[in-house]
Amino acid sequence: MMQLLRRLADQGRTIILVTHATANITLCDRVVFLGQGGRLCYFGSPQDSLKFFGVNTGDFADIYNKLEEEKTVLHEAKRFQNSPDHQRYIANHLSHPTSQQTSNLSPKKVSQNPFKQLTLLTRRYFDLTRRDLVNLALALLTAPIGISLIPLAIRDKNPLILGSEPDPSLAPLALRVLFVFTCAAIWVGLSSSLQEIVKEAAIFLRERLVNLGLIPYLGSKVLILGSLALLQTLLMVGVILIGFKSPEPNLISWQLGVGITTFLTLLTCMSLGLMVSALVKNSQQANSALPLLLLPQIIFSGVLFKMEGIASKVSWLMLSRWSVGAYGSLVNVNAMIPAPTKFPNGTTLPQPFEATPVYDPTWHNLNLNFGLLLLHTSVYLTVTFWLQKRKDIF
């Protein structure tokens, strides 16, 4: 191997070799010995290195033995800096700028074009996504398939429209159906994004060293995941419109309202997934975090349990609360609650579900739900940016 490298060097090529093998090292024109911490202990010809370190055996391995201790490394590095070999092999080969040239020298930072980076990263991320057809199909079809099973479970009931006769079980049933819509969106949103940063951790750090911008990097993630969320929304809304009778619109059309709510829920969940992906250390931790993220969304959504006291405050931190709230406002769940049944003694029959401002069919309430979902998205992406920025090593 060394003979081959010598022939290549004789042909005019520059060969740089990092090795601990000392056999045939005399074939090299120059050798470099580095001590602990990358300190330069010697640079020059192989024969002169033996003289410099006082090795009389002719074995270059003895030089390694001399440089094992840190104190020796510091001493030899300082000695070489003041030696004739340093002057001969290094100082004499360096150009010395004039004082005028020195004053004009200033560090130049390589400029970056964020739009070009965004385009390149988005194209690369898109190519990676479309090549993994199995995961792409699962991401697109999981929620629609799950939602399509609901009509089989509730049989001939129409949970999203008010019937001609009062039904105390209609409002709770409608909420459960809407809750499944939310859970399906949360599940696919998180599972689509939890791996997207942590799996590229090593690549990100390398590219960051060559001027990769954080905003283009995260922007490419948001663009592709947002496009995926749009496709998922179209499929989910299509299944919902086919499988369930549409309620009468109170504010906006059901088709538009359910589409906006589903898309915002998916986008918010994907932003949460990116934040967690930037926080964890490896892909296994990201997978393990999925149940931990999903369970609080279920518990504090306000559907399974009544939110009172501190639980009502915690529910504000859950995107599921705002997603179900938006769905409930569009359906007007409160209007499905029949008038209470009064007994002759003046008491009333307890209702399985009571009207709540969370599902008021007003523009204020609907905009509040949409706005809080967008606020969650902004917070998650901001924290993601901060977490990625902390990983910089320069």
Locations of the language-model features?
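Short alpha-helical transmembrane interface motifs in multi-pass membrane proteins
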Residues: 107-108, 175, 183-188, 254-261
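Helical "lid/switch" subdomain of P-loop NTPase nucleotide-binding domains
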Residues: 1-4, 21-27, 38
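Hydrophobic alpha-helical transmembrane segments of multi-pass membrane transport proteins
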Residues: 150, 167, 171-242
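Membrane-lumen (extracellular) interface motif
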Residues: 25, 130-133, 137, 151-174, ...
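Topological signature of polytopic alpha-helical transporters
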Residues: 30-174, 178, 319-394
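Conserved ATPase "switch" residues in P-loop NTPase domains
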Residues: 9-10, 130, 208
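Alpha-helical transmembrane segments and their short interhelical loops
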Residues: 11, 18, 22-25, 216, ...
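Conserved catalytic segment of ABC-fold P-loop ATPases
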Residues: 4, 14, 27-33
